[in-house]
Amino acid sequence: MKLARLTPSHIPYYIALMRIDKPIGTLLLLWPTYWALWLANAGMPSLTNFIVFTLGVVIMRSAGCVINDFADRKIDGSVKRTMQRPLVSGQVSSGEAISLFILLITVAFLLVLMLSVNTILLSFGALALAFCYPFMKRYTQLPQVVLGAAFGWAIPMAFMASINALPIQAWLLFIANICWTVAYDTMYAMVDRDDDLKIGVKSTAILFGKYDRHIIGLLNLAFIALMLSIGALNNIGLSYWLGLSVAIVLLVYQQVLIQQRARTDCFKAFLNNHYVGLAFFIGLLFSYPVAF
């Protein structure tokens, strides 16, 4: 396989490949990143860090989608939800996908060069996780854990960029985000479970089996417990606790949605997690003075 020149006429297909038209993944990455920036800076992140991390998340999520579709190009045609993706349909070649991935990670690396040396070093972990995750579903029943680490790696990076240290709050938030990510991505995997079983792809939805709802509930309990401890350690104001209360209600609502394990309801529950992330961010936002 050779690298290919990116063609302007294929821009709509590149947009679809990067999922720019489907921002849910970007939002689920952005909220924990913003939590970390606000916690690390007591609600006053620098404008530079805010812009760099926002753009970095958008670009790296796009890069992750590209390498994911490249890794899955031979199996996506067997899954109802993914059979129309650009690499499967032939609208984008494998060479174009790799060229686009290299372009995106290059731009992301240029952005991270604006941050501290230690943050730059941490960014290589983000790249490794983004590259490895798509292949994990072939080798482990827990690819969602790797996804959680990938989706949360901006948390230690945000703390390092802000205070040049990784306090206990950073790691508690990182672990909380892994619990949350595994929970919501298990709901997402429940949508494809029947197809994945046929083609031999592994996931937590398959691993958890009939206990999927119970384990999702336990993961979300761990997530909430960790977010409670973070709030207590940081002595955060009332609005944070209100945001946490809203998040709890939303997580309970998701349990109701997935009760019958219907595909559409599981996907709806997955999408609802955007509001969980937003609730925590609004809570943090109003717990501190207005930033910038």
UniProtKB/Swiss-Prot annotation:
The cellular location(s) given in this protein's UniProt record come to: Cell inner membrane
Q: In which pathway does it act?
A: Cofactor biosynthesis; ubiquinone biosynthesis
Per the record, membrane topology reads: Multi-pass membrane protein
Q: Which CDD domains match?
A: PT_UbiA_COQ2
Q: Which GO terms describe its cellular component?
A: plasma membrane
Q: Which reaction does it catalyse?
A: all-trans-octaprenyl diphosphate + 4-hydroxybenzoate = 4-hydroxy-3-(all-trans-octaprenyl)benzoate + diphosphate
Share an example GO biological-process annotation for this protein: ubiquinone biosynthetic process
* Residues spanning the membrane: 24-44, 47-67, 97-117, 119-139, 145-165, 171-191, 214-234, 238-258, 270-290
According to its UniProt entry, what is the function of this protein? Answer: Catalyzes the prenylation of para-hydroxybenzoate (PHB) with an all-trans polyprenyl group. Mediates the second step in the final reaction sequence of ubiquinone-8 (UQ-8) biosynthesis, which is the condensation of the polyisoprenoid side chain with PHB, generating the first membrane-bound Q intermediate 3-octaprenyl-4-hydroxybenzoate.
Could you identify this protein by its name?
Answer: 4-hydroxybenzoate octaprenyltransferase
Q: Which organism is it from?
A: Pseudoalteromonas translucida (strain TAC 125)
